[in-house]
């Protein structure tokens, strides 16, 4: 409650002097309230919200609270009403003893702006204490010859209350021998004295009993009594006398317990019992007997407990000396306690932030504390310091308040916890200090993006990997903490060969493990460029990127593919021509193969596995060239079969084989003449041919043996002439259509027909039979076979000879002329200047087959001009089609041919570096064959 007016002091109002200033600045005035002691808990003291210019609800919002400097909290704030109320029972005498005015001061802290407001509350005394005597029995000895009017001091009563509530009067029970006199001391204390009114007579009454009553001025007044026992003794005409009316001593507060402080001394001139003096305390508080000891015989005063300047700096007491009969006198004792530096400074935290964000601006207040030292003077002067290497500084506020503020930017990643040591030192000698540690946690903010150890990575994975296999572990680091350091991984959206990157690989968003979603094929995909993004979980989130190159490593999963000679589709056997005049080292043909793999897996080597005539042919290990190993002999068979293996150098190695049929002859007529010794290949066409022959022979033999033979010969002769005429005129209408076998968009090389020559021994007539083809150089399609009228064609050589003048070969079409370099073969063995392309459609294929058939017909007539040089298969330059590897797939670059300069290019060249021989030589040989 507010202080009430008292006397002329106008304190019936609350004095509020407020000077507005910057945060942390002190108010120039103080707020004064008053409250009576012993009020109930929660009693109203003052409207603090109104006096601070706030609404009650703002007390909690702005963090208004009481700071009491370590003393027991006597007051509290009512957050609802905005009032200052009592926190419990208040005892004025306990707080201020007998001080005339009892003020309790504390501060109000407004935390939002760190403002301090000093508050004073005056504790109003109430009459809650009864005057009490030090002892309830007072013994007084009076000589019987004592004259009336003599005064005998009595023990006074004490009342802790002040003002009118303190001790005001004494009363003595009615008695005819005694009266009561009251004396007042300099400090206003009242001392009762017993006045002798009439002479005592010991023989009449030895003991007198009186009652002394002490009363205060409260409303209602309170009182207590003490019993006085007056003993009448014999005459004692001297009283003790102290050597000094007042004794003074000054001692330091740290004197040991039991130290003698001083000695009081009184003299009594009487002798015997009347002269024996005893000492005792007269006017002391209840606490003094616990602090000091007075030797009743010697008058020595010593300490019973340690002195504490901070509790009591000055003691005042009275001692009395009494002789045997009871005469007494009194003296005052003053003890002054000197302060020594025995208390270290104390640090009291008023406001402290246990955690601050790392982006806190400079000058932010993070702590408010109060320094105090219970010592006085220089011993109580306190200074405070912190280490210099910290991003903080101390600023002094009002009284002994200090604030701790930031001076530099904080970085949690550099230092996340600060141990701030506050060292408070007093000015004593020697100085005392105390350290207080403040642990300041720096809260993280998302100021660091995730980082990868490297900006790019190269990862290698073998092809044919299993789906779902882990490829690589991507890791990123974030120097932040908690959610700000929680990283998730993702792949940037992109397309690879028209498909999204997510169809190739995936990434675990938590662990960063890359997984392959499909089995990679080196031949289709050799490299993937990925971009991995790492995001943290901060607000806002930060991210960084990393590029990853995923290289697919080749495995030996593709066997070599043979481009030449091309594998036929109808079961026929390929054939190459080797002249009998060929010398050792003559290039017969070249096996061309490629491997879709790369590196060692595509490094091919060639090996002759099997040959019908061992030692006759040799195959280049790295070139695939089939050459004669020795000169050809007459005993060497016309048909030579070679099995060539092509093997790569992978682990394990893969291989492919091809069977070559080499005809040993100088020209096609010679081949046609000697073809009877060659066994036709087993196939469906040969089976049908045999059946037709058997049926024809049986029919002729059984029914029309002679007639049918003649008639059939004539019919066949006419039919054959018409065919030759058509062929010589360039019509080529009856030439069967052939198809070529393709491999990887590369057309197969030209195939040749297999011929069987049947020579009868009985006449001039011989039959040249053209059965189903079985040579590698030409294939007859099923469609062509079905269009022919018959499968056998007979030619009478004698009749043809007679009819030569009537059958003239038409001049060849110049559009069909080809250079010698255009014969079937590989680009690596051709050195001609002309270049050409593979047949790329059915029309070109049929045209080439027609040329081959025409040349074969001329050779059968003996007037062929197709005599070829060595290795030309009897074809002249004009009919030698140009075949190169221009259209070989791109993987031909993978072919390694160690030890050779030959490469798979489009450049044409000569077969063996020799010019083709003229056609006349072959014609002569053909003539010889006819004579046979």
From Swiss-Prot:
Its main location: membrane. GO terms for molecular function: calcium ion binding. GO terms for biological process: cell adhesion; homophilic cell adhesion via plasma membrane adhesion molecules; nervous system development. Residues 29-692 are extracellular. Residues 922-932 have a biased composition (Basic residues). GO terms for cellular component: plasma membrane. Residues 714-932 are cytoplasmic. Residues 29-133, 134-242, 243-347, 348-452, 453-562, 570-682 form the Cadherin domain. The chain crosses the membrane at residues 693-713. Residues 804-841, 902-932 are annotated as: Disordered. It is found in: Cell membrane. Glycans are attached at residues 419, 545. InterPro entries: Cadherin-like_dom, Cadherin-like_sf, Cadherin_C, Cadherin_CBD, Cadherin_CS, Cadherin_N, Protocadherin/Cadherin-CA. Residues 1-28 form the signal peptide. Residues 806-841 have a biased composition (Polar residues). Keywords: Calcium, Cell adhesion, Cell membrane, Glycoprotein, Membrane, Repeat, Signal, Transmembrane, Transmembrane helix. It is a single-pass type I membrane protein. Potential calcium-dependent cell-adhesion protein. May be involved in the establishment and maintenance of specific neuronal connections in the brain. This is Protocadherin gamma-A7. It comes from Pan troglodytes. The gene is PCDHGA7.
